Amino acid sequence: MDQFECINVADAHQKLQEKEAVLVDIRDPQSFAMGHATQAFHLTNDTLGAFMRDNDFDTPVMVMCYHGNSSKGAAQYLLQQGYDVVYSIDGGFEAWQRQFPAEVAYGA
């Protein structure tokens, strides 16, 4: 895959439930602590190395941000690092929280 794909929150949720992909959240620490998808890994410059050690390049990755804009740059970056399949989640955490309020965790 040379280009990331955009995915809606319903399809992202289904991929998570079926363990077909991992979810990363690239928002700032305060926003992440105030609420994030329960299975999200908080991906930052400081946690990128650990994420890459724990997830093979053939693991599909879904990137979540605030509204679905910043995630596009991060998705492209992960492709450049060698990940085969990367998605940017349309609507970001805001859409996730609206559609799946029971699947929001709080704290770091």
Swiss-Prot record:
Protein name: Thiosulfate sulfurtransferase GlpE
One term of GO molecular function: thiosulfate-cyanide sulfurtransferase activity
Gene field: glpE
InterPro entries: GlpE_sulfurtransferase, Rhodanese-like_dom, Rhodanese-like_dom_sf, Thiosulf_sulfurTrfase
Originating organism: Escherichia coli O45:K1 (strain S88 / ExPEC)
Biological role: Transferase that catalyzes the transfer of sulfur from thiosulfate to thiophilic acceptors such as cyanide or dithiols. May function in a CysM-independent thiosulfate assimilation pathway by catalyzing the conversion of thiosulfate to sulfite, which can then be used for L-cysteine biosynthesis.
EC number assigned by the record: 2.8.1.1
SUPFAM superfamilies: Rhodanese/Cell cycle control phosphatase
Regions that span the bilayer: none
